[in-house]
């Protein structure tokens, strides 16, 4: 592919009010360095946990770090799809998105190193077939498909898989688990800081995915059916992953965690995404570009979690 023009040189310059560039600016303003997080006390807290508690936390971290690595590897075709559309703002944001995913991989690995975990961790995924289906099959297949087919429908399928299911349900539920483990017991302060930093980054990622689906649904109502169909395919798989994880620990899950609580939490996050996408139907596409409701939805989720967890800790 040769280049015939540069978007940053066009009349009027870049639209700094567009959501992708708002997210890009937000990421620059909130930059953080993994090496600045102090994991010293985490090692001491780790040694005090029971064997089952360490097993659960290791499995949870394993799922996170493998997921961050997967997206670091798989997100590039979405950048190419944005280039094919001539959407420089989205391409700029996705370069930051990919960098943040690599940084998340780094910081989870640093935490594992800090608490003394150095063995091969693949076995923690072997008992979770739903995880392997999502991260080793569904995710790479739908993202890599964009290399050959960058169509709006293919973009919606890819965004649903990653931004709405992996991040919008599973990662949020994982953060919820870390909060229940760490905040309510006042342990693992480094992990608490790690989750806070990553959660802030991924709210922007989810907002971009919602924005992308909304603009395609606004442009062509057939893409609403694509969104709805893909969500309905993957929500049961995401919930099955939660059930598989709890099934490994019998009637007494570590940290007194509740399977029903987690299933309800994850389902709520998934179902509420339908409304945000559906209200883009019939809207002017240009209006969607400067509509910040995707970011506001993620901030709402974060505020709700803060209030819920603060009440539980009181």
From Swiss-Prot:
GO terms for biological process: deoxyribonucleotide biosynthetic process. There is a cross-link at residues 71-162 (3-(O4'-tyrosyl)-valine (Val-Tyr)). InterPro entries: Ferritin-like_SF (IPR009078), R2LOX (IPR033908), RNR-like (IPR012348), RNR_small_fam (IPR000358). Binds 1 Fe cation per subunit. Keywords: Iron, Lipoprotein, Manganese, Metal-binding, Oxidoreductase. The keyword Manganese applies. Disruption phenotype: Deletion of the gene does not have a major impact on sensitivity to frontline tuberculosis drugs such as rifampicin, isoniazid or ethambutol, and does not affect susceptibility to hydrogen peroxide. The deletion mutant survives equally well under nutrient starvation or in hypoxia and is not attenuated for growth in macrophages. Its EC number is 1.-.-.-. One of its GO terms (molecular function) is identical protein binding. The keyword Cell wall biogenesis/degradation does not apply. It comes from the Bacteria. Gene3D superfamilies: Ribonucleotide Reductase, subunit A (1.10.620.20). It is an enzyme of class 1 (oxidoreductase). Mn(2+) binds at residues 68, 101, 104. Pfam families: Ribonuc_red_sm (PF00268). Fe cation binds at residues 101, 167, 202, 205. One of its GO terms (cellular component) is cytosol. Its cofactor is Fe cation; Mn(2+). Belongs to the ribonucleoside diphosphate reductase small chain family. R2-like ligand binding oxidase subfamily. Probable oxidase that might be involved in lipid metabolism. Is not essential for the survival of M.tuberculosis in stress conditions. Homodimer. NCBIfam families: PRK08326.1-2 (NF006199), PRK08326.1-3 (NF006200), PRK08326.1-4 (NF006201). The C-terminal segment can alternate between an ordered and disordered state. Ordering of the C-terminal helix shields a large positively charged patch on the protein surface, potentially used for interaction with other cellular components. This is R2-like ligand binding oxidase. The lineage of its organism: Bacteria, Bacillati, Actinomycetota, Actinomycetes, Mycobacteriales. The gene is nrdB.
